[in-house]
């Protein structure tokens, strides 16, 4: 069934446009409440934990969700600004029936979204998303409203951030501290602006803060994981040992070495995988990544006796593959890194701490750790579009794709996909000659831009 509300990572759109309107959002809360009541809830009176990032529209979305859940007899516990992985943690820690994070992740402030976690701390299944969509769009939910004393209540939880800070710090071995390390930390003016500095400072690091002054409008604005230049420049300027750049909801991280060189999710995966294998802590000597990861990752991991399993894009797909086969490390080039022994979803702070652990254990600088991976030249073009058609139905698409594959002569690849969260077509081309693959990628992007606008 084609998704009508949910994309690759929850519901996401410009605030006050479908489906992120107060009416639809309230119905999402009602639908979730109805499903929680239908299945035996954990609590006699069901409860849901709700957090958010720092967008202006977060207040509106929070009120609409709360209204919908309360009207179905579900108690709501509001925890305020907190990273996405923090809600996964709190759903379990607080024995809630579900958790919701209000965020559009790396998108600009005018967008917002909803991600839902089950009582186990993992994002809900595609099947449950389908059920919510059917209830919201095709069902009269008012027939199921709670009455009288069965209505839900709402209260604010003041110590949620502190609980999550302790949980993150538990991902870092007790035998190490971060004393002696100067860390540039960019919080993207987002959900981690209080939590992340506390974590790194309490572990002993000297922290140089960027992106820690949210005003409702500046989340991800030339800051954070999508704009690592601020971090890299600060690393060089302040002679820092490492840079850590989170996105708006802190479920992804991009790092920088002491020279200001960007360390992306592929590098982070490779460094963590080899370290865990050396320690005998990498089940089945396998990691999970997506089709967007650089092919150099596969070759490097093979040289170290590690298998790479690839999935469709989205950390939810990565996590599902990990859980299905018992793997504990996975992630995406974009910086969603999942350490399943500790977190239920991508956690930027946890991923960064794992790399800092390797630095401490090995006594090496991050540039030394990352130097063993030589990426194949890769070009990614994001093309704005107005509609999404089946790719093979676009006139000229199949012929051009075949031509590009022929031009690459088996030494590269082309991958074309739609974003699941934005109106974008993504064109990725890899090959030995950067100028050549850039021309090929632009040729495909131009075709899509012309055909889909």
PLM ranges: what are they?
Residues 242, 279-453:
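Phosphate-binding and adjacent anionic-ligand microenvironments
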Residues 14, 112-238:
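Gly/Ser/Thr-enriched, mixed-charge loops and adjacent short helices
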Residues 1-67, 71-72, 153-183, 393:
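An N-terminal, well-structured beta->alpha segment
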Residues 76-85, 262-265, 289-290, 311-312:
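Active-site nucleophile and cofactor-binding loops and adjacent substrate-binding regions
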Residues 51-53, 185-187, 257, 341, ...:
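Short glycine-centered, acidic/aromatic-flanked micro-motifs in structured strand/loop junctions
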Residues 34-42, 47-111, 198-256:
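N-terminal small/polar loop signature for handling phosphorylated ligands or for N-terminal nucleophile
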């Amino acid at each position: 069934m084609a998704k009508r509300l949910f994309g690759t990572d929850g519901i996401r759109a410009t605030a006050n446009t479908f489906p992120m309107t107060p009416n639809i959002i309230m119905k999402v809360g009602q639908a979730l409440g109805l499903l929680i009541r239908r299945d035996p809830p954990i609590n006699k009176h069901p409860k849901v934990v709700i957090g958010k990032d720092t967008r202006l529209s977060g207040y509106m979305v929070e009120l609409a969700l709360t209204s919908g859940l309360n009207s179905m007899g579900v108690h709501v516990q509001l925890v305020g600004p907190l990273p996405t992985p923090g809600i996964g943690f709190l759903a379990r820690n607080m024995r809630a029936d579900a958790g919701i994070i209000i965020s559009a992740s790396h998108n600009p402030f005018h967008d917002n979204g909803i991600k839902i976690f089950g009582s186990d701390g993992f994002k809900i299944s595609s099947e449950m998303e389908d059920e919510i969509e059917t209830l919201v769009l095709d069902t009269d939910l008012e027939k199921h409203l709670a009455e009288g004393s069965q209505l839900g209540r709402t209260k604010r939880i003041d110590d949620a951030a502190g609980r999550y800070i302790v949980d993150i710090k538990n991902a870092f071995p007790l035998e190490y501290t971060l004393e002696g390390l100067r860390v540039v930390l960019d919080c993207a003016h987002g959900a981690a602006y209080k939590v992340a500095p506390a974590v790194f400072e309490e572990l002993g690091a000297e922290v140089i803060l960027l992106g820690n002054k949210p005003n409702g409008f500046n989340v991800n604005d030339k800051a954070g994981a999508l704009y690592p230049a601020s971090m890299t420049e600060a690393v060089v300027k302040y002679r820092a040992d490492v840079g850590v750049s989170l996105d708006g909801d802190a479920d992804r991280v991009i790092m920088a070495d002491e020279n200001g060189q960007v360390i992306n999710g592929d590098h982070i995966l490779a460094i963590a995988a080899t370290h865990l294998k050396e320690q005998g802590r990498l089940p089945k000597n396998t990691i999970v990544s997506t089709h967007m990861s650089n092919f150099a990752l596969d070759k490097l991991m093979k040289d170290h006796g590690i298998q790479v399993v690839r999935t469709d894009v989205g950390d939810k797909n990565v996590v599902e593959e990990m859980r299905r086969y018992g793997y504990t490390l996975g992630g995406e080039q974009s910086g969603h890194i999942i350490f399943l022994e500790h977190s239920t979803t991508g956690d930027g702070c946890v991923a960064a701490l794992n790399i800092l652990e390797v630095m401490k254990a090995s006594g090496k600088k991050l540039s030394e750790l990352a130097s063993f991976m030589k990426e194949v030249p890769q070009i990614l073009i994001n093309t704005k579009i107005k509609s999404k058609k089946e790719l093979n139905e676009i006139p000229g698409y199949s012929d051009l794709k075949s031509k590009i594959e022929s031009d690459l002569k088996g030494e590269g690849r082309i991958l074309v996909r739609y974003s699941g969260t934005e109106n974008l077509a993504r064109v990725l081309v890899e090959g030995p000659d950067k100028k050549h693959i850039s021309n090929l990628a632009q040729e495909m992007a131009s075709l899509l831009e012309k055909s889909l606008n």
